[in-house]
């Protein structure tokens, strides 16, 4: 049985793998207090990560591949980011964000001392032809999502609409209860809604 890839550049030298198999991996982030990241490999280039933190530590952002899109939802706590231009943005409870490698924070923290959320991470350089074919049948244009939302120059943050709130709740409920196949279906559903968001923003 293979193992889900662990990229130390994404987590930092202090992180360590607790468990790993071909479908999922649990990583201890190595921060003060608690920092657990549970990731599911869904498709080549796409993974779903549940983040469970209880820490007052401010952490430097790690190095990521140059063409990543990340959809994040905050279920509990608050996620705060400082960017290289010293501006600060935060993701409060009940909100979601979409970010790209071109505009990622220099550091992040959890001002309330806790955070529980989920992130869908798309590494467009790692997408296989099979993954792209699956997306095209829906259709979902992953290249279009980043360009139309202006992710090269900003961090897109929004209150979560009811249909997305329901979807995120299903993801949280499914942890430890459902197989990776279930998360694949929900990831496609989430990406479908991101495609619709692109259209709403009038960028066709």
Annotated model-derived regions:
Residues 1-24:
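Short Lys/Arg-enriched alpha/beta "domain-start" segment
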Residues 2-7, 47, 67, 160-167:
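Alpha-helical structural motif
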Residues 13, 17-18, 62, 76, ...:
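Residue-level detector of solvent-exposed, low-hydrophobicity positions
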Residues 17-116:
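N-terminal functional module of multi-domain proteins
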